[in-house]
Amino acid sequence: MHLSRYIAVLLSASSFVSALPLQNDVISDDGSKPIDAIMATAMEHKVVNPENLDATPATPENPEDLDKRFYYTGYKRNAETPEDLDKRFYYTGYKRNAETPEDLDKRFYYTGYKRNAETPEDLDKRFYYTGYKRNAETPEDLDKRFYYTGYKRNAETPEDLDKRFYYTGYKRNAETPDDLDKRFYYTGYKRNAETPDDLDKRFYYTGYKRNAETPEDLDKRFYYTGYKRNAETPEDLDKRFYYTGYKRNAETPEDLDKRFYYTGYKRNAETPEDLDK
């Protein structure tokens, strides 16, 4: 009785042990400790989708952040040239690290990029107003280039434009310095620190005249203001004007004759005797 009972207990224990897995069949990666075979089996059958790993990043990234991140590393879309890449990012306002918005505009201007619906002329105007210039172009060159194409500063009339360029000595194409002087004289412009009288004198010496003014009118106008020709004394001035019949203001012909008689002047084809008579 006791023996049969003891045998039954042994058989029961043996069946329980045989049901357990062999623990030395599965060990950890470093070989230091066994892994439960049930857990190992579960791990072998678990399938992890890589897309699921990217589906929930630590910090969600919007499309703009994605574009920026790839732009900084130089990635581009398929069939997209480096120039296309630059253009695409320029239109969305991205910039290189340590690059100000002004630097961005300059960089794209030099490569000829422009804003949407902006003509080349609009591009030039936009950059002129902000003071950008072409390579190896001085500020004076910049002014000249824009003057020739008719651009002007804000709140500047065409007359203001002409004056500004006249003071710096610019001229129109196929226009000589004399043509420049004439054009500005007719519109009343003058040189810096030059009075209206200085202006008249300068133009008188070079023979310029006012519109609808004959050479005689020119002589009269200058005589009344006391101007004279180069290397001409006051006496020479009086003689020249006497012979042509000019007189001083508020002076009668008799006064004119008296003045010239006292100084010994005479009319052409008149002898000293005729003068005395």
Curated annotation (Swiss-Prot):
Transport recorded as keyword: no
Functional pathway: Secondary metabolite biosynthesis
Signal peptide (residue range): 1-19
Please summarize what the entry says happens upon disruption of the gene: Abolishes the production of asperipin-2a.
Keywords (alphabetical) are:
Signal
- In terms of superkingdom, the source organism counts as Eukaryota
Q: What modifications does the entry list under PTM / processing?
A: AprA is processed by kexin proteases to produce 11 identical copies of the hexapeptide Phe-Tyr-Tyr-Thr-Gly-Tyr, that is further modified aprY and aprR to yield asperipin-2a. The bicyclic structure of asperipin-2a is likely synthesized by the single ustYa family oxidase aprY. The reductase aprR may be required for the final reduction to yield asperipin-2a.
Q: Which residues form the propeptide?
A: 20-69, 76-88, 95-107, 114-126, 133-145, 152-164, 171-183, 190-202, 209-221, 228-240, 247-259, 266-277
Q: What does this protein do, in the record's words?
A: Ribosomally synthesized cyclic peptide asperipin-2a precursor; part of the gene cluster that mediates the biosynthesis of the asperipin-2a, a bicyclic peptide that possesses two macrocyclic ether rings consisting of 14- and 17-membered paracyclophans. The aprA translated product contains a 11-fold repeated peptide embedding the hexapeptide Phe-Tyr-Tyr-Thr-Gly-Tyr, that is converted into asperipin-2a. After being excised from the precursor peptide by kexin proteases, the core peptides are cyclized and modified post-translationally by enzymes encoded within the corresponding gene cluster.
Question: What is the protein name stated in its UniProt record?
Answer: Ribosomally synthesized cyclic peptide asperipin-2a precursor aprA
Q: Which organism is it from?
A: Aspergillus flavus (strain ATCC 200026 / FGSC A1120 / IAM 13836 / NRRL 3357 / JCM 12722 / SRRC 167)
Gene from which the chain derives: aprA
